[in-house]
Every structure is written in structure tokens, then in C-alpha cells.
From Swiss-Prot:
The modification N-acetylmethionine is found at residue 1. Its EC number is 3.4.21.26. Signal peptide: none annotated. Belongs to the peptidase S9A family. This is Prolyl endopeptidase. The modification N6-acetyllysine is found at residue 157. The keyword S-adenosyl-L-methionine does not apply. InterPro entries: AB_hydrolase_fold (IPR029058), Pept_S9_AS (IPR002471), Pept_S9A_N (IPR023302), Peptidase_S9_cat (IPR001375), Peptidase_S9A (IPR002470), Prolyl_oligopep/macrocyclase (IPR051167). It comes from Bos taurus. It is an enzyme of class 3 (hydrolase). The lineage of its organism: Eukaryota, Metazoa, Chordata, Craniata, Vertebrata. It catalyses: Hydrolysis of Pro-|-Xaa >> Ala-|-Xaa in oligopeptides.
């Protein structure tokens, strides 16, 4: 490999902050201003060395061509019924954004209802959330530009796809809930702020409000229905009960799976919605999560983790709501996690469980909770579902590492309740029968058994010679279940690779216990679990350190950066996407304050002691041994990322280049690429996705000397 001449970057040694008596220097704090000329010059100088490096990777062209070819397969969502019509999303293959179609019947001709591709030339305007009125005649839809979390809500009459004049701004992390009379909709907005709000600003998001918009009026006339002036971090999302009588308000403070639950009986508002609603505080603490499923009169069914870390179903009668009076409808499973529940055909409940990171789907009786049927599923994930209380049918979508998607339809009016394949998609050019997926359980440092999926070509020799791509996340109660990824399958097929996904602690794979095992004081467990996954792959002969790439995004970017700092000898290549790198300051920007439930906050002395031990920015050091250098590193971020603001990766790369990159023994590249008109990832246009994965895998191939296999 070659040694690099990195840009000269100014270090402000006077930028020192006192944390509980510890003086911490932050020499690149000036990079926190995204609009300064200095920051723009830094980004330009970094991109100037990174872009040519990526473009000169011998396989980039081959990879991009193959990705474009194989990703060109049809992508469907489940059909869903609204009013008298059916709707579904469909992407012909390489469209930048998926398109919403409408049909008068399942067999009827499909017409375009909403095509986000017409809203920008480069595909960077994306649909972010939508909600149909109860009768299906109107749809509200959110649009986001350049990947920002900020949303503009517009409205359309479905008949004739006619756009209305109503426009809602200042919207972010919002609910969209119509009242059943179709007159208007609840949504969330933030107060006006100084300066811009286009996703390139870093100002913090506080004081979210719940508003009600009456169709056909100006946003300035919208009605304030709930606010929490004493609790700036609270966010309250509304939904309507199935019968339309109750507004349920779910209040969250951070990312923990806990919420308060207030409700308003609209029958107690004789003049309609005219101001702050008469909220009844059913649950007024953050000691559990309460997810509304359905109700019969005043008896409400909730999915909860209160005293049940794997979740259960309970009934609460609003006329007799004491906790001692709650009834268990479906008890907690000792091992499997209840992920979601839906009520359908008025008397059935569909329950989706996670069993050892694989989904199972069941039908239960709503009155008794009894199991009626288990739907047959291969090993994989349920990634789509539709079917509401008044529907008599359900659709569900299955995917796995080797199957792009099968949509099933089940008519619940039929005696035998047999699902049929409604749509199945195949990808030309990758024959699933050539590959195999195995799930293993490896021991972590403390002996905990961690699940990991491994995908590879059948019949490979486990001689340590294969390039491997290890992915992890490990946070926020999010489970990483099997999914179909063309870009990773190309790595397996054309780069002779082994794909591994480690289901480390911090995620939700085994309920709230698994989540709590990888947060706050236990965060190091995530890093240990991931490093032990790498050691397992090496020990079993799948790969060797010099052939191993680790990858993660967001909280997973934090994961791989920390692992590079802690064990630079264990990996050949690290790709960190939109990572959280400055653990002492993350809470000060946009929505970062919500993550303190997983990470803690440096304002607290005890939390500071945890964070300073692993914060990627504060733990970069040149390895002592002469024969150990940092792995090749590529950090990816974007100018409109207002979730993990793009100051994290620039500060981290500047630190890496300064402390490590100037050493004679550091021949592996330490690079960053900052994309423009892009954000944290949601709604990213297909064209940008293809460029990004081509960069990633070209970087891996160049750094690890991997040849292309035709």
C-alpha cells in the first residue's frame, strides 16, 4: 500500500472543555459549524483525495455495472385497502423513488396515485410518511428534501389524484392521524427557530407540539392540542382508536421502549376539536411501553413490556384502569419476543414473534387470546404486513438473505385460512441454490452466546483465505433480521466473500433484557460481542484479519470505529457510515438528546466516565507494536444528515489523520467522503445508493487486494 499525504488541518489547542474536573481538548471543534468557509474547505480537501482514490479502484466500474444490472428487479410493497380501493408501492427496478399505485379491485388496472420521482430531477425528494383518511378519499403525505428529517406535509384527493392547497411546514418526527369524520388530521410540529431548517443546520429539536389541521384551512389556523412546556424533550404522537372515538397520545422522551399514554374521549368534546384536549392520564410514567392494538368499547388491548421484557398482550378497561385490574390476554413468551400485533376481521389478532432472530407469524382469537394458526414461513423476516380491523384479508411480505421477497395473501373469511403466494420476485443473475445461510451461536467475552448469520458460496474451504464482510448495529432495541442485499451478494458472488451479521447486545433480538445488556454502563458489551464475532470467523477459518472488513451505520458506525480503536490488529478494513463519533457532545445537536437513554450524557459525571472510555474521537492512539497499524478506514457522511450531524465523522477523521496517519508505519488509508444533497439514509435515491455501495466495495477491494471473479 501507499503512504498518504493528508491535508493540513488547523488544530485549535485552546479549545479545552472541563468535564467534571477533566480537561478535554477538542482541537477540531471549529468543524462543528457546517456553514463556515473553513469547514467547507476541509470537506473539499478531503473529498479531493478520497474521490480519486475510489475512482481509481480497479473494480469500481465492474462493481457499479453489476450492481446496476442486478438491482434492476421489481420491488413491491404489500397491497393495502383504504376505503373501497387497494393501494401498493412499486419500483420497476432502478427508479430513484418508489411510486404509489391505486386499484379499484385486486384484479383491477393499477393507476399512478403519487410519483415522488416527478418532484425533483435527481430523485432527492422522497416520500416520508403518509396517512389516508378513514374513507380512503384523501391522503396526507410527507416530503423530505435531500435526506433531511424535516418534512413538508401535503394533501391529495385520491379520485383524480388532485393536489389540494393545504401545506404543513416545521414538521419532524411526526404522527399523521385523521379523525374518522375526515375533517382533519393530527400532526407534530416544532416552534419556529432562528436560521435555516433544511437539514444542514445542527440546532437542537425541542418543544415538539401536537396540532390538528382542518382540511381546507391555512396552517396558521391549526389547533394546538397538546404541548409540554416543562418537558422540552417530550414528543407526543397521536392515533385514533379503531372506532374513531378516542385519541390516544403516546409520549416519549428518548429512544427507550417506554411511553406515557394519555387519551381523550372525543364524545367529551361536544364542540369538536377547538383547543388543548381533555387528556386523561392513563399511564403517567416511563416504566413500560404501551402500544395500542384495538379496543371493544372501553376495553383496550395493548402490547406492553411492563413486567414482561419480551412483551405480552394486556387488556385495560378505561372505566377501571388500576394496574391490579389489568387482564393478561396473551402472556409473555419465555424466549421469543412479540414484535407487533394487528387486529383484523374484528375478532382475530395477528402476532409476529422473533424466535432466535427469525420471524414467526400467528393468528389468535381476540376474545380469548387462544392460538388458532401458525402461518408457514421459511427462515427469514416478515418485512411487510397489511390488514386492519375492518378488513377480511391480510397480506404479508417475507424476505431472507437469499430471497428478495414473497408476498402472501390470506382470505380470513375462508374456513381453511390458507395463505397463497400473491407475488414472488426473483433476481436474474444470482442463483440462490449456489449459496447457503447458517446461523451459529458464538461465546462473547463474558460467556454470553451471541447469534450470527453467515452467508457464503456452498462448498468453500475454511482455510482462512476468504474476504469477509461483518456487519453489526447493537443499539436502541433494534433487531437486525435477515434481509436481501444485492450489494452484499455481489461481494459474495464476485469477490469470493463471506457475509456475516452479528446480532450483538444493545439490539432487541431477545427483548428488553438484550437491549439493556448493551447500553449505558454495559455499552462495552456491544464492542466485545462484535470483536468476538470477528475472532470466531477467523478461528473457524472463514477469513483472516487482513481479509476482514467491518461495517456499520449510525450507532453501527460508532461500533466499528470503537472496535478499530480497541483492536486495530483484528481487521483489515473499516467502513463507518454516518457514525456517532463524539460521545461527549452528541446530545447537543438536533435530536441527539433522545439517544441519552442508550448512551448516557457527558453532563453527568458517572456517564462521562463510561463515555470517555470508548468515545471514538477520544480514544485514537498509534498502536505501540511496530507491526500493527490501523486498518484501512473509510468514513461516509452527508451534508444534509440532521440525525447524526456531519460534524462527527470530520472531527474523527481529522484526529485519525493527525495522530495515526502521519506515522511512517501507517500505510493503510484513512479517508472520508462527504456526500452532497444526501442525509442519514432514509429516502436515498437509487442512483445515490448505487454510487455509495460501489465506493464501499471498491475501497474494500483496493485495500485488501481482492480480485473480481466473473
Amino acid at each position: 500500500m501507499l503512504s498518504f499525504q493528508y491535508p493540513d488541518v488547523y488544530r485549535d489547542e485552546t479549545a479545552v472543555q472541563d468535564y467534571h474536573g477533566h480537561k478535554i481538548c477538542d482541537p477540531y471543534a471549529w468543524l462543528e459549524d457546517p456553514d463556515s468557509e473553513q469547514t467547507k474547505a476541509f470537506v473539499e480537501a478531503q473529498n479531493k483525495i478520497t474521490v480519486p482514490f475510489l475512482e481509481q479502484c480497479p473494480i469500481r466500474g465492474l462493481y457499479k455495472e453489476r450492481m446496476t444490472e442486478l438491482y434492476d428487479y421489481p420491488k413491491y410493497s404489500c397491497n393495502f385497502k383504504k376505503g373501497k380501493r387497494y393501494f401498493y408501492f412499486y419500483n420497476t427496478g432502478l427508479q430513484n423513488q418508489r411510486v404509489l399505485y391505486v386499484q379499484d379491485s385486486l384484479e383491477g388496472e393499477a393507476r399512478v396515485c403519487l410519483d415522488p420521482n416527478t418532484l425533483s430531477d435527481d430523485g432527492t425528494v422522497a416520500l416520508r410518511g403518509y396517512a389516508f383518511s378513514e374513507d380512503g378519499e384523501y391522503v396526507a403525505y410527507g416530503l423530505s428534501a435531500s435526506g433531511s428529517d424535516w418534512v413538508t406535509i401535503k394533501f391529495m384527493k385520491v379520485d383524480g389524484a388532485k393536489e389540494l392547497a393545504d401545506v404543513l411546514e416545521r414538521v419532524k418526527f411526526s404522527c399523521m392521524a385523521w379523525t374518522h369524520d375526515g375533517k382533519g388530521m393530527f400532526y407534530n410540529a416544532y416552534p419556529q427557530q432562528d436560521g435555516k431548517s433544511d437539514g444542514t443546520e445542527t440546532s437542537t429539536n425541542l418543544h415538539q407540539k401536537l396540532c390538528y389541521h382542518v382540511l381546507g384551512t391555512d396552517q396558521s389556523e391549526d389547533i394546538l392540542c397538546a404541548e409540554f412546556p416543562d418537558e422540552p424533550k417530550w414528543m407526543g404522537g397521536a392515533e385514533l382508536s379503531d372506532d374513531g372515538r378516542y385519541v390516544l397520545l403516546s409520549i416519549r422522551e428518548g429512544c427507550d421502549p417506554v411511553n406515557r399514554l394519555w387519551y381523550c374521549d372525543l364524545h367529551q368534546e361536544p364542540n369538536g376539536i377547538t383547543g388543548i384536549l381533555k387528556w386523561v392520564k392513563l399511564i403517567d410514567n416511563f416504566e413500560g411501553e404501551y402500544d395500542y392494538v384495538t379496543n371493544e368499547g372501553t376495553v383496550f388491548t395493548f402490547k406492553t413490556n411492563r413486567h414482561s421484557p419480551n412483551y405480552r398482550l394486556i387488556n385495560i378497561d378505561f372505566t377501571d384502569p388500576e394496574e391490579s385490574r389489568w387482564k393478561v390476554l396473551v402472556p409473555e413468551h419465555e424466549k421469543d419476543v412479540l414484535e407487533w400485533v394487528a387486529c383484523v376481521r374484528s375478532n382475530f389478532l395477528v402476532l409476529c414473534y422473533l424466535h432466535d432472530v427469525k420471524n414467526t407469524l400467528q393468528l389468535h382469537d381476540m376474545a380469548t387470546g387462544a392460538l388458532l394458526k401458525t402461518f408457514p414461513l421459511e427462515v427469514g423476516s416478515v418485512v411487510g404486513y397489511s390488514g386492519q380491523k375492518k378488513d377480511t384479508e391480510i397480506f404479508y411480505q417475507f424476505t431472507s438473505f437469499l430471497s428478495p421477497g414473497i408476498i402472501y395473501h390470506c382470505d380470513l373469511t375462508k374456513e381453511e385460512l390458507e395463505p397463497r403466494v400473491f407475488r414472488e420476485v426473483t433476481v436474474k443473475g444470482i442463483d440462490a441454490s449456489d449459496y447457503q445461510t447458517v446461523q451459529i451461536f458464538y461465546p462473547s467475552k463474558d460467556g454470553t452466546k451471541i447469534p450470527m448469520f453467515i452467508v457464503h458460496k456452498k462448498g468453500i474451504k475454511l482455510d482462512g483465505s476468504h474476504p469477509a464482510f461483518l456487519y453489526g448495529y447493537g443499539g436502541f432495541n433494534i433487531s437486525i433480521t435477515p434481509n436481501y442485499s444485492v450489494c452484499r451478494l455481489i461481494f459474495v458472488r464476485h469477490m469470493g466473500g463471506v457475509l456475516a451479521v452479528a446480532n450483538i447486545r444493545g439490539g432487541g433480538e431477545y427483548g428488553e433484557t438484550w437491549h439493556k445488556g448493551g447500553i449505558l454502563a454495559n455499552k462495552q458489551n456491544c464492542f466485545d460481542d462484535f470483536q468476538c464475532a470477528a475472532e470466531y470467523l477467523i478461528k473457524e477459518g472463514y477469513t483472516s484479519p487482513k481479509r476482514l472488513t467491518i461495517n456499520g451505520g449510525s450507532n453501527g458506525g460508532l461500533l466499528v470505529a470503537t472496535c478499530a480503536n480497541q483492536r486495530p490488529d483484528l481487521f483489515g478494513c473499516v467502513i463507518a457510515q454516518v457514525g456517532v463519533m463524539d460521545m461527549l457532545k452528541f446530545h447537543k445537536y438536533t435530536i441527539g438528546h433522545a439517544w441519552t437513554t442508550d448512551y448516557g450524557c457527558s453532563d453527568n459525571k458517572q456517564h462521562f466516565e463510561w463515555l470517555i472510555k470508548y468515545s471514538p474521537l477520544h480514544n485514537v492512539k498509534l498502536p505501540e507494536a511496530d507491526d500493527i497499524q490501523y486498518p484501512s478506514m473509510l468514513l461516509l457522511t452527508a451534508d444534509h444528515d440532521d440525525r447524526v450531524v456531519p460534524l462527527h465523522s470530520p472531527k474523527f477523521i481529522a484526529t485519525l489523520q493527525h495522530l495515526v496517519g502521519r506515522s511512517r508505519k501507517q500505510n493503510n488509508p484513512l479517508l472520508i467522503h462527504v456526500d452532497t444533497k444526501a442525509g442519514h439514509g432514509a429516502g436515498k435515491p437509487t442512483a445515490k445508493v448505487i454510487e455509495e455501495v460501489s465506493d464501499m466495495f471498491a475501497f474494500i477491494a483496493r485495500c485488501l487486494n481482492i480480485d473480481w471473479i466473473q
